[in-house]
């Protein structure tokens, strides 16, 4: 089994055009050193993969969070498709071992360079889309990205207090108040408890290491209550 057969087995998809898969993992430095081989670098596939990734992640967020405001979905998507996240995804599926680099780039540590790994992940998405279609891209993301979204890995990018305000004020003017109920623990490791009150009714309680975190936690609880009635 060669490395490209191994890679296809690893990702769970067979490529009709294996050259497309190889191109996705070909850095421009490799092309510069192998001009006689008529190989192409992955930059065009990266361009396409970036767009496909934005679309598929946007679609997933749109359906998973039906009450989330556009601004919050935009922030969450940005956190998912940013370079550090893409590097994490690429490392999870061991993409670095398959990258084709020029000797100079290899010596310079290119195989572990974050920007390069992020680009490779996007170019793979582009190649997978061209060869297998959007449905197979979604299946791949269901293994690599969507479980992290489901686990709440990117919810810290969301301002729950603002989101709660947008939800409850859609149809009427309301008064939203936050109360700090108390604090526990020693001075160096305190925890605060908070509650959110909407028009005199307690909708949520939460705790956190700071007063702001406790209020955000209370707002998140209130949102869950409102959206799962």
From Swiss-Prot:
Its EC number is 3.1.26.3. GO terms for molecular function: double-stranded RNA binding; metal ion binding; ribonuclease III activity; rRNA binding. Disulfide bonds: none annotated. Keywords: Cytoplasm, Endonuclease, Hydrolase, Magnesium, Metal-binding, mRNA processing, Nuclease, RNA-binding, rRNA processing, rRNA-binding, tRNA processing. InterPro entries: dsRBD_dom, RNase_III, RNase_III_dom, RNase_III_sf. Mg(2+) binds at residues 46, 119, 122. It comes from the Bacteria. It is found in: Cytoplasm. Residues 159-228 form the DRBM domain. The active site is at residues 50, 122. GO terms for cellular component: cytoplasm. It catalyses: Endonucleolytic cleavage to 5'-phosphomonoester. GO terms for biological process: mRNA processing; regulation of gene expression; rRNA processing; tRNA processing. It is an enzyme of class 3 (hydrolase). Residues 4-133 form the RNase III domain. Its cofactor is Mg(2+). SUPFAM superfamilies: dsRNA-binding domain-like (SSF54768), RNase III domain-like (SSF69065). NCBIfam families: RNaseIII (TIGR02191). Homodimer. Belongs to the ribonuclease III family. Digests double-stranded RNA. Involved in the processing of primary rRNA transcript to yield the immediate precursors to the large and small rRNAs (23S and 16S). Processes some mRNAs, and tRNAs when they are encoded in the rRNA operon. Processes pre-crRNA and tracrRNA of type II CRISPR loci if present in the organism. This is Ribonuclease 3. It comes from Listeria innocua serovar 6a (strain ATCC BAA-680 / CLIP 11262). The gene is rnc.
């Amino acid at each position: 089994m060669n490395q490209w057969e191994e890679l296809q087995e690893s990702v769970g998809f067979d490529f009709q055009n294996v050259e497309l898969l190889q191109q996705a993992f070909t850095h421009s430095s490799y092309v510069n050193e192998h001009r006689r081989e008529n190989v192409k670098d992955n930059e065009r596939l990266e361009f396409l993969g970036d767009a496909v990734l934005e679309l598929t992640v946007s679609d997933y967020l749109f359906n998973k969070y039906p009450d989330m405001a556009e601004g919050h979905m935009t922030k969450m998507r940005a956190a998912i498709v940013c370079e550090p996240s893409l590097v994490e995804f690429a490392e999870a599926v061991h993409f670095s071992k398959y990258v084709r680099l020029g000797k100079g780039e290899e010596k310079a540590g290119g195989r572990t360079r974050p920007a390069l790994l992020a680009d490779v992940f996007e170019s793979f998405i582009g190649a997978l889309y061209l060869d297998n279609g959007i449905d197979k891209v979604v299946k791949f993301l269901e293994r690599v990205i969507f479980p992290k979204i489901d686990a709440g890995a990117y919810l810290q990018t969301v301002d729950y207090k603002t989101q709660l305000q947008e939800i409850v004020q859609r149809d009427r003017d309301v008064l939203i108040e936050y109360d700090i109920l108390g604090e526990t623990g020693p001075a160096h490791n305190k925890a605060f408890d908070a509650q959110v009150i909407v028009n005199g009714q307690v909708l949520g309680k939460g705790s956190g290491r700071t007063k702001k975190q406790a209020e955000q936690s209370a707002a998140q609880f209130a949102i869950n209550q409102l959206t799962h009635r």
